[in-house]
Amino acid sequence: MKAGFAQIDFTPLEGFMPGEGLPFWARGEARCPLLASAAAFAGEESVILVSVDALSLFTDRADDLRARISEKTGVPVSHILLAATHTHTGASGYEENSGAPGEPLVAKYTDDCIVNAAVQAFENMKDGFSLGTGKGIEDRMSFNRDCVLDDGRIVSIPGKAAKDHIVGYLGTVDHDVHVMRVDGADSAPACFIVNYANHPDNDNTKRTHFSSDYPGYLRENLQMIYGKDVVVLFLNGACGDVNAFNYKSGVSERYASSNTYMPEEMGKLLTETVCKINREITATDNAPAVKAATRTDTYQLRVPAAWEVEKALATKAQLDAGERIVNSTRRVMESTLSYDPTAPATMEMEMVGMRLGDWTILTVPGELYTEIGLAMKAVAPEKKILVSEQTNGRVGYIPPDKTLGTTAYGGRYYAGMLGLGTKDKMVGAAKALMEELG
């Protein structure tokens, strides 16, 4: 088959890191560099995938990047995937994001590197590659983080002190790990594409340097094992309600202990799993399928719950009385009170389906809850369906109806754009794309 690969390091020397509601500043050598890793494939159609070590790419930014790549390569916009790994220790974008100021110069440099990586991968395409896929399970370090407490409250990320009060979880976890290996004419690995669902928000108190979190350490480990020139793309799965902390256990897992660097340890565990899967993969050159399709559907926008409005009005009263309010609380208040019931109640959102060998990748431009991701994969259980979140845009958290309006973090008004009926719409879109791609 015909394929090409490229990677470009875009780590700034210093700058803000969005992701935790505060303006954390990075300076000095990165713990693990930020890369744009790209793969291009040609068969009956041509496609380009770029994995970007970033928290997210706002939709207008992703649209512009895809258009630039399309203009330079001739690959249709609909056949280009830009997947943010969702690291919480990446660089800022053009505008304020999660408490971190925008840095336009950093963002422009990042964008140029993303485009250049995609174009280089396209220009590097040549014949002689073979492809194989495998699947396994990694269930040692991912847990649902929307906890139901014994007093009936739903609390996201409750902390270990809540261990004796957790009676259940609002959602579940997808432990699947999908691995694609592309071999060169010399039968040596040229590229890995890995799909796994977990939040890359694991720097804790070490949030002083840029880091690509566990996906970056996975990449470094695979390059140490299989060769420094191997390009590794990471596509994050549906992990909007998942992270690496088992709050019910009340103890720190080995990879999260105080004397370890958590992203590095998580990278080691995922590397073990990927290598185990890889040993069972056989790459072939039997002209694998390469094609893509896109569809845009209309979704209901989110509406604030009564308790959210009440809380926002109370915060405003405190502010008007001269009390000091932390910035994160102020942002929530401003977002909630900005709701306009006379404004349009719907929005358009794109989903791309990409066939690559025996994989079908379905893209979602936000932080997808596991329940919806699993439902999308279930539309054709006999096929290898992957969900790639934070891809080609950002609409915030995407939870099922049962989570909306609750105190779960992703269900609150300020946390996302999509409202009631989203799960059914997305499952319908996934089914239609699967039928179109065959």
Task: Give short role names for the model-derived ranges.
Residues 270:
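Anionic-ligand-binding alpha/beta catalytic cores of soluble enzymes and soluble regulatory domains
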